[in-house]
From Swiss-Prot:
Purpose of the protein: Involved in ookinete evasion of the mosquito complement-like response, oocyst maturation, sporozoite development and infectivity.
Something else known: Addition of antibodies against PIMMS43 to the infectious blood meal significantly reduces transmission of malaria parasites by A.coluzzii mosquitoes.
Tagged with keyword Cytoplasm: no
Organism of derivation: Plasmodium berghei (strain Anka)
Deleted gene: phenotype: Formation of oocyst in Anopheles coluzzii mosquito midguts and development of salivary gland sporozoites are abolished. Transmission of parasites to mice following mosquito bite-back is abolished. Parasites exhibit normal development in mouse blood stages and normal gametocyte-to-ookinete transition.
Name of the gene this protein is made from: PIMMS43
Localization in the cell: Membrane
Coiled coil regions in record: none
Position of the signal peptide: 1-24
Membrane topology summary: Single-pass membrane protein
GO cellular component: membrane
Protein name from the UniProt record: Ookinete surface protein PIMMS43
Quaternary organization: Forms multimers, perhaps with an unknown protein(s).
Key words, A-Z: Membrane, Signal, Transmembrane, Transmembrane helix
Amino acid sequence: MIKLCTFLSLFLIFFFLNLNAINGSGNTGEVVQGTISVDSISKGMDSDESMLYEKNEYDNYQIPNICFDNTGIHQPRFIEDNKEYLYNKIGEISNSFSTNLNNYTTFMHELYGLYNDHIDVSMDNFRYGYIFMQVNFSKHKNKDSTAKLVVNLYGSVNKTHSAGIELAQGSFEVYLNQCDLAQNKINATITDSIFVMHDNTPAKEDHVTSTHDNTNLKNEDSLNKLNDLTKIHSSLMENNIDNTEHFITVDKISECIFQVNKLEDFLNNCMTLTNNNGPNSNENDDALKKHKSQMQKKIYRETLFSNFKESIVNKDMEGCKKNYTLLMSNSIASKLMSVFVFIAVIIYIL
């Protein structure tokens, strides 16, 4: 009896399985649930019209017509010239970049790895380094228009056998075809490349070296002002100056060396009286004799005070010392108080 029941059970299971197979074979045009048609795959869509994969945002960038037709007459086109439009567009670019950061930082990962491979930033005497990238481009006029890529490299270390630091800076410039960039070509056409190595010795002329035989040499004077900003930034970092908390003065020591100091250092140097720049009573007396009335003397003191302020603004150390010493010997107590109040305002309020 048990064998008979087992046989009947297996027979019924086999019968229903075949019945489902027979019913399904008649619907040849129906796609089995859970599979995806070839057309859907080619369109990148799932069966429920959802995306199979996340398309890269730059897959369908707009490619200018001038990249394909360099001779035809084109209708004039204009970007809206109101501030709100440009502000919103820059904001959209920033948001897109921040939300798809991994799509844009691959090159920086490679460059940082290259830097760290040659200069181990984990060494004990490593101080500071940076990799600064900038892309400059003007109006895209034709299929030969280019964009300029600038990469600045910097590194500094503490000397181990003597006092001081050692630093080096170089910049690489390359021109890339704008049409290739617009089409997101990995191997964009390079029209020119330049590598400049900056000497860190102020007394010497900058020397230039090339990366390979067909690299054009370029004089230091051709570097743009943005390179100067990177040098100023590196000087701030080297001197541990927080430019959000201190007013700073910048002095250009040479074409590639900038010295950054706190404003208070400038003022301390200005207001340090020595035998050479101390108050000269004879000079002051002669000046006052020319102004006999009280009104004339008052105007003279006001002029000194104005010149003193201007010398600070213009970073004129010689003029600052001269006018400060004259104020010290000519000003009344209230005017001296105004001087120090002015200095305090410069340091802590402006």
